[in-house]
């Protein structure tokens, strides 16, 4: 029996990856798993959603998590990575879906019928996109640059640590999506 098609999507912060993942899932009529992975991992583990969310994009070598987990054999970040990996594998086995982030491309690396994608955009585009969000703070572009870099460093550090690959490196993905607005897109939006 053929394995269901799964699309994994990693992305730079504010590159439009979340929106693209939702559009792909809607167009194909398949579920998108993003923050739902936190809820599902919490249900399986007995950990709180808050603890799982706080440990995302953290590596087990973090001092905060080492202190938090004193006395336990496995750091929380490692527990969460394993939990979410198991949830991702279970969801992929259940049927077609889109998995956003959480090293999905690596977790499903040995599984057939997985399209591994990475979404990226130029810094200027990402700043404009971040500023246009309803919950965006009003701050100068240089501070947005700092925020974007901080989020990307956390994602890269987490991915690089757990996968021993490099986050965003083309050889880890089947498809790279560049989300800079083209003149054609600008015309269409008028």
Please report, for each region that a protein language model flagged, where it lies by residue.
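Pre-Walker A (Motif I) flank of P-loop NTPase domains
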Residues: 3-7
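A conserved segment at the C-terminal end of the G1
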Residues: 22-28
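ATP-dependent small-molecule kinase phosphotransfer cores
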Residues: 41-96
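Conserved phosphate-donor/acceptor-positioning beta-strand/loop module used by diverse small-molecule
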Residues: 110-131, 148
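C-terminal accessory "lid"/substrate-recognition subdomains
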Residues: 144-174, 190
């Amino acid at each position: 029996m053929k394995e269901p098609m799964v699309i994994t999507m990693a992305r730079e912060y504010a590159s439009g990856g979340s929106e693209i993942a939702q559009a792909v899932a809607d167009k194909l009529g398949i579920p998108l798993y993003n923050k739902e992975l936190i809820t599902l991992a919490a249900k399986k583990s007995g950990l709180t959603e808050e603890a799982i969310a706080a440990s995302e994009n953290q590596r087990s070598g973090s001092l905060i998590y080492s202190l938090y987990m004193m006395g336990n054999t496995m750091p929380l970040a490692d527990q969460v990575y394993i939990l979410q990996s198991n949830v991702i594998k279970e969801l992929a086995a259940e049927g077609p879906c889109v998995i956003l982030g959480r090293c999905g491309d690596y977790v499903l690396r040995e599984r057939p019928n997985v399209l591994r994608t990475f979404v990226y955009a130029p810094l200027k585009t990402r700043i404009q996109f971040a500023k246009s969000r309803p919950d965006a703070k009003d701050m100068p572009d240089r501070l947005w640059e700092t925020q974007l870099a901080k989020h990307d460093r956390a994602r890269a550090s987490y991915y690089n640590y757990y996968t021993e690959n490099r986050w965003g490196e083309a050889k880890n993905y089947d498809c790279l999506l560049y989300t800079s607005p083209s003149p054609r897109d600008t015309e269409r939006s008028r």
